[in-house]
Amino acid sequence: MKNIFTILTLSITVSLVAQTHEITKHNGIKMEVNFIKTANNLVYYTLPQSAEEKSISQFAISQLQEKSKTEVKTISKKITLSGKADYNKVIVLKPSQTEGLQESGIITSFLGKTKGETNQSFLDEAEKRLKQNAALKGSPFIVIVSNKPKKLKAVMYTYK
């Protein structure tokens, strides 16, 4: 009976150890975690000595390495901006998708709505303007806070 219990305990322990991964962030910091899943631009994990589920934005993570197989999976590539022309590289996130990124400031702008302009074309132009301002300041991520005609506002995020 003791042997069965010992074998069962060892097999459970080995399976838990086999799930250990190493997350490498874009700033070079490495974290040892137990990877759970990726969903909605978030990576869910637990720390090795904890059962509490945590999450981090997939945009903050460079790669995920499975320790048991030495298998490396690229999660995201680092976004580098060289000026206003790179506004297409700026990503609009939801507030919940910014975990692991650092807030770097707030940008505001004014955009007049012309007569006959549709709401969708206005929103597209407003997003483009905010992305251009973020690219000019070197921030690859924004969260749009307000997209009203006289008060465009977004929070900028960069890598920690």
Where do the protein language model's features map onto the residues?
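Bacterial Sec-dependent N-terminal signal peptides
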Residues: 1-22
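Compositionally biased alpha-helical segments
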Residues: 19-141, 145-149, 155-160
